[in-house]
């Protein structure tokens, strides 16, 4: 893994180190493909602690069998209406499920949750749009690095009416793990302390902490804050 120093214009110069690695290979060549998850590079603090992708969720790729439909309906109920409609039409479906979900005709994957609980430095990190492209902050500035990952896909061989062939194992390509990431000069311990103190004293404004010897940005808290998963509510 190589390291490339890049500049990010935000209050100060030195902010991020980009880490790149080899991309995973993918396989194509079947009739029906389900995209399970498109990984995005992790944003780390200066100590390589993850500031994104720190938590996980479970995604299941489900074959359109009677047993699978019964499992989804029985365990997920109305929360899986769209997936059930797809399964009943004869197409496989990918759906987020509880980790304890059980189904004989499915593949389960643990994938990163981009923004989880206890997020820090929202204005620095920024957020992505519905298509997974960076809109603001580091997500936008390093979108070409964070977004250069092959999606995890499951490909089925199907019959003449588009239903997966019984007894034929699907082909899995790609990975849920990103091949690249960005390391910031932000220190999550300092960031957490600054955010905690400032939110009790500031309705509007910002607090910046810099390393005097180097000018590196250690923390930046801006208020009002926002959730990257509910930007419209900010």
Task: Mark where each language-model region is.
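Periplasmic/cell-envelope proteins involved in peptidoglycan metabolism and beta-lactam response
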Residues: 1-233
């Amino acid at each position: 893994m190589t390291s490339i120093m890049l500049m990010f214009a935000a209050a100060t110069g030195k902010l991020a180190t980009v880490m790149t690695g080899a991309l995973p290979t993918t396989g194509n060549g079947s009739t029906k493909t389900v995209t399970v998850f498109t990984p995005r590079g992790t944003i780390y603090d200066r100590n390589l602690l993850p500031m994104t992708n720190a938590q996980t969720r479970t995604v299941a790729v489900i074959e359109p069998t009677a047993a699978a439909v019964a499992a989804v309906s029985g365990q997920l109920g109305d929360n899986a209406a769209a997936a059930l409609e797809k399964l009943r039409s004869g197409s496989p479906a990918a759906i987020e499920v509880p980790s304890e979900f059980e189904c004989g005709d499915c593949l389960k994957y643990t994938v990163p949750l981009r923004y989880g609980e206890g997020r820090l430095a929202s204005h620095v990190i920024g957020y992505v749009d519905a298509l997974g492209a960076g809109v603001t902050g580091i997500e936008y500035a390093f979108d070409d690095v964070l977004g250069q990952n092959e999606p995890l896909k499951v490909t089925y061989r199907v019959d003449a009416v588009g239903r997966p062939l019984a007894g034929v194992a699907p082909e899995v390509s790609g990975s849920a793990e990103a091949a690249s990431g960005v390391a910031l000069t932000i220190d999550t311990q300092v960031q957490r302390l600054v955010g905690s103190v400032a939110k009790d004293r500031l309705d509007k404004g910002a607090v910046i902490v810099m390393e005097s010897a180097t000018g590196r940005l250690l923390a930046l808290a801006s208020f009002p804050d926002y959730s990257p998963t509910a930007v419209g509510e900010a």
